[in-house]
Amino acid sequence: MISSITSTVKHIVASALLLAALGSCTTVLVRTTGAEGITEDPTARTAGAVVEDQSIETKVVVNLKKLEPELKKANIKVISHNGVVLLVGQVASDGLKARATQITSDSSTKIKRIHNELEVAGKTSLLARSNDNWVATKVRTLMLANSSVPSGQIRVITENGAVFLMGLVTQANADGAADLARNVSGVTRVVKVFEYLN
């Protein structure tokens, strides 16, 4: 019975990985039709990059809590995009903020850069977190409605009123996204954590 369940789980996992890989292939094939020949979208993350980012996030979260017990009391979000790691939230001291950077750096050799935007402050309230979700939704909606901003390539993270923008974009796209976010009510500041194509 257990081996049957294990076998079924293995098949489900293999099928999910195959579908993810085929999804990436479909993107490539769609981009190869027409008279232009084969081109790549330099802004698109591969399925492997997405999995690697998830792995980085998991390793960092686990290590922060296991290697520094004081960080269990902190409010820390870890976001990885194409190997660029963003730390946001609140910690009790500058020492814990520095320790979070060190633990993050030691968690994976796949990390390209770390942006530590942790605040030395008490945890945000439930109301503040709800407001952050609302602000992020408004920013994403504005980006979707604006054809000059590649919303599918930009991640929006909001923490305590600050909006962090991540992705692999051109300087013009980054500036356009930041300008949109800046004009949303409830935004206290906008931080660009982009990788640039040009």
Which ranges hold each PLM region?
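N-terminal targeting leaders
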Residues: 2-17, 23-198
